[in-house]
């Protein structure tokens, strides 16, 4: 039940085609920079006069207004503004991007989908459409909750590899093993950490799972020597 249509938005015919489609559509999603759709006569205010039930979703890097709104960007840029890249650095301390484009997929696509679905439910009840403004950098920052909570708790930005979810705890870390592989331990709950310590024959480390700072370093070294 899907169709692919190409419309030349620089032509009057293309704009007219979009207007005809909008009249029968439930959702319109656009990813132009702020102001482009208005110049084309296809912005939210114009489209809602054609279809009052329309859900109109704009996905941009930095939102519809503000000092960065007119900047182009990619996932890597949004991750940096959200503080994600600063938590995943390479050996020379350069911020890096993970293999998963989290700002594009989590900040953009997933956040948009959730907003659109909620707006569709509302439209079924109210008969009115909604405008949804998705800023990928903003949504990516909302996903960076562990680093934000650490900053609030400890009064500063956690160093790379020192956040509670990125290596800052012995019980939630990765360890090089004697056979040249890696062992990932995700044993935040006491019962799981206790079982792990018993399994590697280090029951003395059971109280050390949540050690931080220098104590954390000593506990991590002890575990690494055991695996």
Language-model regions, residue ranges each:
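Active-site-adjacent "lid/gating" segments in soluble enzymes
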Residues: 38-188, 195
């Amino acid at each position: 039940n899907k169709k692919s249509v190409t419309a030349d938005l620089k032509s009057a015919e293309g704009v007219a085609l979009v207007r005809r489609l909008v009249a029968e559509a439930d959702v319109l999603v656009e990813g132009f920079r702020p102001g482009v759709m208005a110049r084309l006569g296809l912005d939210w205010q114009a489209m809602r006069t054609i279809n009052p039930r329309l859900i109109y979703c704009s996905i941009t890097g930095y939102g519809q207004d503000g000092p960065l709104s007119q900047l182009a960007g990619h996932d890597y840029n949004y991750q940096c503004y959200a503080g994600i890249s600063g938590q995943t650095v390479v050996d020379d301390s350069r911020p890096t991007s993970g293999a998963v484009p989290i700002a594009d997929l989590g900040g953009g696509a997933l956040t948009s989908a959730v907003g659109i679905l909620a707006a569709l439910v509302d439209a079924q009840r109210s008969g009115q459409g909604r405008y949804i403004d998705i800023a990928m950098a903003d949504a990516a920052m909302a996903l960076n909750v562990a680093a934000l909570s650490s900053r609030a708790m400890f009064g500063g930005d956690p160093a790379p590899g020192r956040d509670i979810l990125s290596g800052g705890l012995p019980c939630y870390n990765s360890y090089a093993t004697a056979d040249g592989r890696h062992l990932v331990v995700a044993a935040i709950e006491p019962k799981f950490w206790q079982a792990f310590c018993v399994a590697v024959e280090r029951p003395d480390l059971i109280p050390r799972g949540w050690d931080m700072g220098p104590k954390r370093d000593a506990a991590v070294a002890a575990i690494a020597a055991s695996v």
